[in-house]
Amino acid sequence: PIVISSQILNRQDGMDEYHARPDDIEKTADPRQARKFADKVLIPEKDWHSDRRMILGFRTARSGMTLAVGADHEIITENEYAALIDTEPGMGKRVYRVEATQGRPIRIDKAVAYHTSRGVPVHELFDRVRRSLDRVREQGHNVYYDEQRAWLDDYWATADVEVEGAPTGIQQAVRWNLFQIAQASARADQLGIPAKGVTGSGYEGHYFWDTEVYVIPMLTYTHPRIAENALRFRVNTLPQARRRAKELSERGALFPWRTITGEEASAYYAAGTAQYHINADIVHAIMNHARATEDKTFLFRDAAPVLVETAR
């Protein structure tokens, strides 16, 4: 028999059903390396399952943000099989034990939905996850494959960089980095773009001035809507920047060196207070976006207070 196991797991709890523990992160002085959390970050609030679906709900310990994740499974095979599904706080699993035979394929269609919010309760996010998974069942997976392909075709039509005469590895590296930018920025949703994107835990998910200097210029010329969406993070966190300026006896606003919420997140005072160029980086990105798009709507309607406060 073949055993196929699909799990939703909060890995911070330490180990999965096979007792596999995430590697302990070596303690070093490297600021890029994320540390283990001393306390639990995701607090389980709710779990539920049916014959083919499992949903888990969490709340973050400090900020109170909510999260729900659900998975649907469908097995398609002529082989005999037994199925088990179960959930508990912080973990859900769907297990198939298939009596596999030669020439009879085993196919499992799986759909996963995530919903998160700063203020919506977990039970409401459960309903949103259910509706998302219901749509996948009704419409089929191919609809989403086609939508994803269309989005990526549009992205590469304007973002691709061809390196002529260079070794294959150079072209591959350039396109890999462009793909990572797409992953990290496409759904920033007026939040920042983490320094390590969505491919790792380095820098603990913090946003730096690198976004305005390196990432947003590229997006401004290729996908200005995504660039504007990322710039809105600075507009939305202007109140925190004003408070930071007062803490350092400055006028106007001082944007943080590294942040998630808009507050300075660095525990190293020297680095967190020395880099005054960050204000200029942000203003440069805003003005470059306005000039490149020849659209001053975002500048005058939303971003002007940032320019004023950083100039004081």
What are these regions (language model features)?
Residues 1-203:
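Acidic/polar, glycine-enriched structural segments that form the non-catalytic walls/loops
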Residues 142-291:
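Substrate-binding groove/exosite segments of carbohydrate-active enzymes
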Residues 294-295:
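Short, surface-exposed connector motifs at secondary-structure boundaries
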Residues 298-303:
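Membrane-interfacial loop-to-helix junctions in multi-pass inner-membrane proteins
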